[in-house]
Amino acid sequence: SLGIGLTLEIKLDGDSMTVCIPADKIQESENKGIKSIELMPFFGAADHTVDGYLLYPDGCGAITKYANVDQRSKNVKAFTWDIYGAEQVDFNECKQMEKDQKYQAMLPIYGIKNGDNAILAAVEKGAEDTSIKVSPDGFIVNLNRASFAFNYRHFYKINLSNIVVNGASVLRNTMGTRVDKEMIKTDREVRIFFLSGETANYSGMANTYREYLIKSNLLKKVIIENDNIPLALELFMGIKENRLLFDKYVTMTTFKNAISISEELKNAGVDSMQVMLKGWTKGGYGLYPVNWPPEKKLGGKKGLREFSDYARKNNMQIFMRNNFIQADSKNRGFSTRNDVVMQGSNLPVTGMGKTEFLFNPFFALQRFVSFFNEFSRWCSEGVALERIGINIYHDYNKANPAGRAETIEKWEDMLDTVIRNQRPAAVEGGNQYVLKYADRLCDIPVRSSQYNITDEEVPFYQMVVHGMIPYTSEAANLSYDLTMHKLKLVEYGCMPYFELTYSKSTNLNNTEYNKLFTSYYINWYKQAADIYNEFNERLKCVWSQKIIEHDKMEENTYRIRYSNGITVYVNYSKNDIECDGYSIKGKDYIVVGKGGVIN
């Protein structure tokens, strides 16, 4: 009666099943359309009497256990994650999420375990316009369930005071919501893997998904057998301090200083480093959209070339960090009408101060290509791209409209440009579309958003990626407990990572980067070298290996098994414990080889 219809195509494919909704077989009436379709919302649903849980990719990964239904509020709600980031383009909401440590879904998956059986569902087509919905027992019905919702139209806000009838505004200072007229015309397809027995758990799901990504050429192999675990060193170089009359440039690390710090670390035994330079461009960090040239006060182009030569001679991998997505109108160099992301109301997407903008994906790619051509004339280093593994968005810009799929294409074009020119590419964030390009992943979360439906955090993302692409989480020098931070690196398989400066961090107190509250290299380089040497002595044997099993043995104790037969036990408690017949000291870890030999 609504004049709406669709076709659901279901096919069995070995030990998996595909479910597809072809775009050309969706029917809509003249005045009625589809906003979203929730696919098979009760497939695999179970109540609290079943031994099982729901898995979802919130940050590192999280699970909701059926048995804990009584520990949840009677008014428990479902939670939804937009895959690859929020559907609504909102500067302020994005900043608040990061401030509150709320994470997004970087992988387009969910899992359901019911006793000795489990499913893993993964979006194969249309992930960028899909949401993951997790509904615990007690929300509407007494069933635990998870599903995908395919989004076919976006909502956008309009100012209702702009609507005029008979010469007068209908509603003053009131915002309303509209929906796109045109449907997103892409096929949607989900693959559902069936697991049983010993594989019917989140470890089995991670193994299944990793092998699927490898087979589909969606996950790059970067780490080579017997590689050292590199020290990830980020050097913060410069930033402007805003003052009443004249801004002051604050120099934290020059190119010559970068060589000095690298030498200190090398002399302390660090012979494998990945160095990332941050705030190296003219004007300093955060002066978007300036991407070139190097700041003269840091040594300019000559200093960059000297550091590049030093790095090449010492077999160091260098990444020059840059941002091609964000812009600030105070810095000029772009049009706030033609070059930035627009809302459906034909107004630009801005932050609270109305000076922050996002670049249209086509314009962002154009700026990147221009930068890369000039950059390549001066050095042969790698590029680190901020935000492209975190942010995708749609743009109503009339000159160059873009959906979320087109935005991903432009981000992939940037990465492809780097790789085709035989440069390494680092990416901030780890959305799945970067995994076939990235040589390094930055800021990968080692926790979930800790919503009230979550019972346990699991390193699902790390289990998929470990042994393939190196990744970092948070800077060790900014942790409040270095020992506990180190144990988290061991459990989650992260590179040791420090963000340091040549000058004292107190120089940043009056800048917008005062979050780097302890970074003076004199205070940290020995600890960085100690962790590097310890990890390579004890954990090098698993660096290139896949994590095939992760188990919580008891409170604060975890067992991680690798594809070469080596097992690592991590004890976060202050007390010594016994686990599987092995003694583990408080706040420590052990590495057990195939023959039971402890390292």
Task: Describe each model-derived feature in a short phrase.
Residues S1-T251, I259-M273:
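Carbohydrate-recognition beta-sandwich/jelly-roll modules
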